[in-house]
Regions:
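Hydrophobic packing and interface segments
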Residues: 1-192
Length: 192
């Protein structure tokens, strides 16, 4: 029930995010009054590609952030095992509060760049062309192209990552139970 519920929940979350993105896009088009996005204009096409790239870049930055935060946690746990005798035997209590503190601080610190990217890039697209004297309608189309790229790429990337995560989870469970590879049973902790 747990995996099925999680998989169903992820599907609903992806569908909800896709519909929300489309609703925001429709609201943007209505608010700006643009009647279409002409991708034959080079700046608009460029922003479409930039938008398509953002979910991938954000995901890479977020995964790196998780890895760095996890390494900080591993170092703290190793320190506690070295310095506090009796943790492994269950006679001494670990310093849970330090682990929670590291987790909180590291997650906030490491997610600054992805957060700034998602907030700053649309603002940059909106205001930087004004410095160069571009027409406001072309800027509106550029932002629309950016939003379209983010929406399409983001939905596809979410589906891909959901499926990849499910495959990794199933592979992990298979190895925990034992998998036959080339006639040999392979278990968790083996070279496979």
């Amino acid at each position: 029930v747990g995996n099925t519920t999680a998989a169903t929940g992820k599907g609903f979350a992806i569908a909800s995010a896709a519909l929300t993105s489309l609703a925001l896009f429709a609201a943007y088009v209505t608010f700006t009054g643009i009647d279409g996005i002409n991708i034959f204009k080079a700046p608009v096409l460029a922003m479409l590609f930039v938008g398509g790239m953002i979910p991938v870049v954000f995901s890479a930055l977020a995964m790196n952030a998780v890895g760095r935060a996890a390494m900080e946690m591993v170092q703290e746990v190793r320190r506690q095992f070295k310095e506090i005798s009796g943790i492994m035997e269950g006679t001494a209590k670990p310093e849970y509060d330090k682990c929670v503190d590291i987790s909180t601080k590291a997650s906030l610190k490491q997610m600054m760049l992805p957060g700034l990217l998602t907030i700053g890039l649309p603002l940059l697209i909106a205001f930087l062309p004004l410095v160069f004297g571009m027409d406001q309608m072309i800027i509106a189309e550029m932002l629309g192209g950016y939003m379209a790229g983010v929406t399409v790429s983001g939905v596809l990337w979410a589906i891909f990552q959901n499926n990849a995560g499910g495959a990794w989870d199933n592979a992990k469970k298979s190895f925990e139970a034992g998998v036959e590879i080339n006639g040999e049973m392979t278990y968790k902790g083996s070279d496979a």
